Amino acid sequence: MAHRLVEELVREGVIKSESVRRAMLAVPREEFVMPEYRMMAYEDRPLPLFADATISAPHMVAMMCELVEPKPGMKILEVGAGSGYQAAVCAEAMERRGRVYTVEIVKELAIYAAQNIERLGYWGVVEVYHGDGRSGLERHAPFDAIIVTAAARQIPPALVRQLKEGGTLVIPLVEHMGQILYKVTKRGERVEKRAVTYVLFVPLRES
């Protein structure tokens, strides 16, 4: 089932790199969804978790991973851990040679994500923190890339500060026509924004 879904995403042009293709095949999505949704794990759709959170659709996970171009040795910050699935995919795309720091504002979700990450052997490559991801994670900055998995009204300044020069921030922003996913590149004191596609994410929560 995973193979069929991944090959469909390759045909659709969502998955472009072999590293993301391998990662999407390697990470068992059924282990990151609630038990009652395991039979739907390889449908290309978001699924409910708890605390009004969802696990993103596979095409969106693959797309965001492609946009940051993960490579061995990178440091990636994720804002919004959810169940830990996106972080695990990024870790696999880096061949487990790098570090993913993921911050979750809902304590119960942070615990759930940490349990999944540890149970599936990603602990040490992925670190889960409970906190307000809008503030980033200063102690581990700067980051090669940052992925935000909830829709913000503006780019949190702390995330730009904690991004390396030339680094990539992928973030959905709420605009008057809806939510748009942006790829943001840091260039000195300014950022370059490129619109990617319309999306629909849960709102970025505040503590």
Swiss-Prot record:
E.C. no: 2.1.1.77
Main localization category: cytoplasm
GO cellular component: cytoplasm
Pfam families in the cross-refs: PCMT (PF01135)
Keywords of the record: Cytoplasm, Methyltransferase, S-adenosyl-L-methionine, Transferase
Database matches in PROSITE patterns: PCMT
InterPro entries xrefs: PCMT, SAM-dependent_MTases_sf
GO molecular function, one term: protein-L-isoaspartate (D-aspartate) O-methyltransferase activity
Active site: 56
Cellular compartment(s): Cytoplasm
Family: Belongs to the methyltransferase superfamily. L-isoaspartyl/D-aspartyl protein methyltransferase family.
Functional note: Catalyzes the methyl esterification of L-isoaspartyl residues in peptides and proteins that result from spontaneous decomposition of normal L-aspartyl and L-asparaginyl residues. It plays a role in the repair and/or degradation of damaged proteins.
Name of this chain's protein: Protein-L-isoaspartate O-methyltransferase
